[in-house]
């Protein structure tokens, strides 16, 4: 099969939009081109991917390789697409099966040796991956962050061979257990310690309850810092 599709996620603040990595192998002079609004780090991934594939004892196809990162209008940055690109090339060239790829989303930077390096924004990715009913595959370096997503299925590996071994069924990876995080309110000064200042305290309570902005103006010594230091103690939990 000369076409393979692998799923990944971009990083956009706390969002992780889906990126479809399409790899097509065609006859012609050997080349590798990446399209789909890639940044510099993504364009440089072709050299990292080539070295990782060769050093993992796979063959790098001597064909014309086109890699499309869709959607085309979404900027792609970082080395997080190294792993899905490498897996797409291996799948399109028939070196690994394509049947299990639709069930996973991959993100990892590749070293030239084939080792997986950590990337930023793994937690938003694992949350979105779980919502899409897929399993996230991340570097071992990001395993602790990825398991914060609760019941989301997460697989972690240290090398490209770990991932290909799982996809081929030779050496399946064990899903990581979810980490339970308990919320703990920080120790804050108590607003009840403030004597008087009834109007100011009332303003703090209204701002905290309604999520309003608050501006304190006044000469030194009138209690602005005293009141501000006690505001966190009456704020509701973050969503």
Predicted regions and their residues:
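Post-Walker A helix-loop "phosphate-sensing" segment adjacent to the P-loop in P-loop NTPases
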Residues: 233-239
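Peripheral, non-AAA+ core regions of ATP-driven protein-machinery
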Residues: 1-226, 232
């Amino acid at each position: 099969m000369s076409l393979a599709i692998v799923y990944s996620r971009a990083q956009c603040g706390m969002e992780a939009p889906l990126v479809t990595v399409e790899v097509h192998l065609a006859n012609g002079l050997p080349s590798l081109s990446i399209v789909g609004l890639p940044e510099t780090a993504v364009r440089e991934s072709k050299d990292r991917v080539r070295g990782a594939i060769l050093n993992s004892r796979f063959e790098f196809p001597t064909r014309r390789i086109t890699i499309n990162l869709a959607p085309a209008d979404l900027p792609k940055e970082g080395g997080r697409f190294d792993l899905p690109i490498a897996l797409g090339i291996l799948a399109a060239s028939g070196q690994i099966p394509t049947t299990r790829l639709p069930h996973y989303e991959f993100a990892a930077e590749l070293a030239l040796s084939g080792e997986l390096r950590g990337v930023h924004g793994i937690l938003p990715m694992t949350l979105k991956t779980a919502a899409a009913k897929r399993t996230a595959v991340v570097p071992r370096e990001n395993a602790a962050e990825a398991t914060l997503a609760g019941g989301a299925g997460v697989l972690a590996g240290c090398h490209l061979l770990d991932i290909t071994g799982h996809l081929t069924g030779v050496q399946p990876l064990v899903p990581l257990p979810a980490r339970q995080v308990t919320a703990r309110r920080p120790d804050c000064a108590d607003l009840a310690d403030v004597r008087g200042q009834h109007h100011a305290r009332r303003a703090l309570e209204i701002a905290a309850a309604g999520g309003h902005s608050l501006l304190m103006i006044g000469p030194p010594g009138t209690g602005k810092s005293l009141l501000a230091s006690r505001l966190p103690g009456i704020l509701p939990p973050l969503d």
